Amino acid sequence: MKQTPIDPKLIDSLVGELGINDFAKATIREVKLVAARAEKQSGVEFIKMEMGIPGLPAAKVGVEAQMKALGNGIANLYPDIQGLPELKNEASRFVKAFIGIDIAPEGCVPVCGSMQGTFASFLTCSQADSKKDTVLFIDPGFPVQKMQLQVMGVKYETFDVYSYRGERLGEKLESYLKQGNICAIVYSNPNNPSWICLNEEELKTIGQLATQYDAIVMEDLAYFAMDFRRDLSKPFLPPYQPTVGRYTDNYILLISGSKAFSYRSEEHTSELQS
């Protein structure tokens, strides 16, 4: 047996203790719990990447701006129902600077965490057309999103992208879309937990099929610009963060401020709609 840092028997016993039938299908929280117990029992430290916790020091300009806003009494007010113009305008500018596409400020919707953004988006997509009652996930993805659909009573389909990269993706995707019941297509790019990135051709395929079959793409950009094979950090200069938004008008982008800016704060996630 190959030597590993952690005895496989320890992991197997922990998986059994926690009642996990198939570890390959374990949730993020289950994986974290197994890792925490294995770390405690073995004394071997784990590098934990499963929860996507920011961790880097928050930008000074953000901290100072938040303190100033609190000092000016913002904490006792609800924001305008149309959204704070400064935030919506800057969100639009951010998208132009780092994704290279145009989204009007009216289409930039600040939400209390990406989970709230996906919940609201699922509600909208699943009720837009009575004939389209199913959400399609290009996995692996965020298990909580499927739990949200279960709470709503919305059906979903799923397939693992691993075996359908490149040209094979279009055929697989169309096999679902041509049934006529798919209201939305969901994926994350860069992907957590597999850390793969869909390329421009794959995004083009998704976008064109979404237009053809009138489905809405929900592109989760929680790990925004974290494909470090290219420098995506220069505003208003290519290369930009890849997005399906170049290939269809039927899309919603979900950008996590806590991850993109390492600024957890009171939640600064934006939902961006074309």
Stretches found by the model and what they are:
Residues G19-D22, S194, G257-K259:
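Glycine-rich "substrate-gating" loop/helix at the edge of Rossmann-like oxidoreductase active sites
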Residues G71-Y213, M218, F224-T248, I252:
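Conserved core of the PLP fold type I
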